[in-house]
Design a protein with these regions (language model features):
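Phosphate/nucleotide-binding beta-alpha loop and adjacent structural elements of enzyme active sites
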Residues: 1-141
Length: 141
């Protein structure tokens, strides 16, 4: 029989972080806060009409950069941002390079997670590394 906590140590040593499930009451409280918000700006489509596309408020003039975790092999959203002068920092451990045709500000072959270790980088560490002086309201995630 394994000692208590042995499973968590085994997972941690592989760069996998296992935390206890939060109480249901906390999850319910969070779910109550999540709902659509009306924007004062019209929405514009960025990216493809299928996977990889998003409707975003047309209020991008002060945006300095995009942080895009999970790139895959295409980046239509990031390509449309670049047409507006907004470069992207990309992270994805499952691919080896930036998608063809995209000029990225940076690419890290890592998964974005809660902690920086092994094949993972914490969001805060990633942003601090590449945009240390940017304010949160100047970035897109």
């Amino acid at each position: 029989m394994q000692a208590p906590g042995h499973f968590r140590y085994d997972m941690f040593s592989q760069g996998i972080f296992v935390d206890p499930m939060p109480p249901t009451s906390r999850l319910d409280a969070l779910a109550q806060k999540l709902h659509p918000q009306q924007s004062q700006f019209p929405l514009v489509r960025m990216g493809s009409a299928a996977d990889g596309g998003y409707l975003v408020p047309d209020d991008l003039q002060d945006i300095k950069a995009c942080f895009s975790p999970g790139v895959d092999t295409f980046a239509t959203f990031e390509t449309d941002l670049l047409k507006r002068g907004i470069g992207s920092h990309l992270a994805d451990y499952s691919v080896d390079k930036v998608p063809d045709g995209l000029q990225a500000l940076s690419f890290v072959k890592k998964f974005v997670g809660g902690n920086t270790a092994g094949h993972h980088v914490a969001l805060e560490d990633w942003v601090t590394q590449f945009e240390p002086h940017a304010k949160n309201d100047e970035l897109i995630l």
